[in-house]
Amino acid sequence: MSHEIMRLSAFAPAKVNLFLHVGGPDGEGYHPISSLMVFADVGDRVNLQPADAPAFETSGPFGDQIPAGGDNLVVRAGQAFHRRLGGPVPPYRLILEKHLPIAAGLGGGSSDAGAALKLLRDALAPALSDDDLEALAASLGADGAACLRARALIAEGRGERLSPAPRLPELNAVLVNPGAPSPTGAVYRAYDAGVHPDGAAMPPMPDHLESAEEAAAWLAFATRNDLEAPAVRLEPHIGEVLDVLRGEPESLLVRMSGSGATCFALCASDIEAEGLAERLETMRPDWWVRRCRLS
């Protein structure tokens, strides 16, 4: 093992749930889900650098809003990796450039942790298998393994049963966050207060979808986000974002991602997504707005 860590950097993409079906809690309090997850070309970045002593730092527009101690998933990823190696490691610094909003339904913490795990494997244990790395990611949270893979997939069970997604067309989208956090635990508790006859059943999946229009039509007809209504009840600003997006001509499908508060609009093309994003930035400069491509 080298006595000094090499300098490395990894992108941590935003996760978007195109649909999220949720069942009632099981005996241990976990909710079964089925979800089609895709990943955006916008996200955070994690940097690994040599250091005289172990350190974790944050930067970026949302860097001052995240915990720097053991509650941060990047720190926990490092701790889990050290336990897996079982021996001393050279000191290093992890720097999280936080560009995604906090508690936003974009899997940011899990994606950051996945990026950190990849960097640590590259620097310290390149022989560590993908399965071992995925087990570490899964131990950090329900989205951990999915965000480590960072490609379109179907998640079922508690989020741990992953399978390839059907072939998807190019999906251009606009992500919008109203600047209000939507804590996952609170949204699930609000969900549990209701009645949910549909449960987490997986809809029949087409083999492939030829266009963004076809994908949006199928998603609107066959799927939903079961956490959207309880999240809107808790945070009305989410409902405001959804209403605005649904009133825009470029929007093929409008939905909340994960437990919110970020919402997305699928658009027919990159040009339409760009136009929608620019208009929203002018209309609502207080909102976080990003045009992106999903895959």
Curated annotation (Swiss-Prot):
Active site: 15, 143
Annotated gene: ispE
Catalytic activity, EC: 2.7.1.148
Single GO biological process annotation from the record: terpenoid biosynthetic process
Pathway field: Isoprenoid biosynthesis; isopentenyl diphosphate biosynthesis via DXP pathway; isopentenyl diphosphate from 1-deoxy-D-xylulose 5-phosphate: step 3/6
NCBIfam families membership: ispE, PRK14608.1
Name of this protein: 4-diphosphocytidyl-2-C-methyl-D-erythritol kinase
Keyword hit for ATP-binding: yes
Domain of life: Bacteria
SUPFAM superfamilies for the chain: GHMP Kinase, C-terminal domain, Ribosomal protein S5 domain 2-like
PANTHER family: 4-DIPHOSPHOCYTIDYL-2-C-METHYL-D-ERYTHRITOL KINASE, CHLOROPLASTIC
Signal sequence extent: none
